Amino acid sequence: MSKHAEAVTLRLAQPDEHKALEELQRRASLELDDYREQLLANPDAIHLPPSQIANGQVIVAELHGEIAGFAALVGGELDGLFVEPDLWGGGIGRALIDAAAHEARRKGLALTVTANPTARGFYESCGFTFEGETPTRFGPGLRMSR
C-alpha cells in the first residue's frame, strides 16, 4: 500500500462539505498545466454540482479527520477525481478509483473517465485502457475505461 492509503477512510460526501470540496477541486485543478489558463479565465468550469452530493455520487477520502480527496461517480463515469496536491502520490487517488470501480461494477457498469493528458499515466497504472481522444470544453480529453 502507498504511504497514505492505509490511513484513509472512504465515505459519502455530506451537503455541508460542498464548499470545501469545490475549493479542493480548484486547488488540484490549478496545480496542473493542462488547462490552467482556461480554468483561470473560466472559473465557472470548476464546479461540483450539489445534486451529485445529494444523490450519493461523491466519495470522500478522509485522512486524519480531514478531507484529502474525492471522486464523483455518475453512473459508470468518473466525473471527477481530485486529491489535495500535497498528498499526490500517496495512494489516495488510487483508493478513490478502486471504490468508484467497485460501485460501477455493483451497478453492472464499466468505469470510464475523460482524463486530462497529464493524468494518462496515473489512470493506466490504475488499470484503465486508453480508448481515444474526445473533445472537451478546453481541448482534447482522453477517453479511458477499466
What are these regions (language model features)?
Residues 1-16:
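Conserved N-terminal entry element of GNAT/NAT acetyltransferase domains
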Residues 18, 22-48:
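Conserved GNAT-fold acetyl-CoA-binding loop/helix
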Residues 49-60, 77:
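A short helix-loop-beta-strand connector motif used in the catalytic cores of GNAT acetyltransferases and
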Residues 60, 66-82:
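Conserved beta-strand in the GNAT
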Residues 79, 84-88, 116:
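Residue-level recognition of the GNAT/N-acetyltransferase active site
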Residues 87, 91-99:
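Conserved acetyl-CoA pyrophosphate-binding loop and the N-cap/start of the following alpha-helix
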Residues 94, 116-141:
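Conserved active-site alpha-helix within GNAT-family acetyltransferase domains
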Residues 104-116:
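Conserved GNAT acetyl-CoA-binding A-motif
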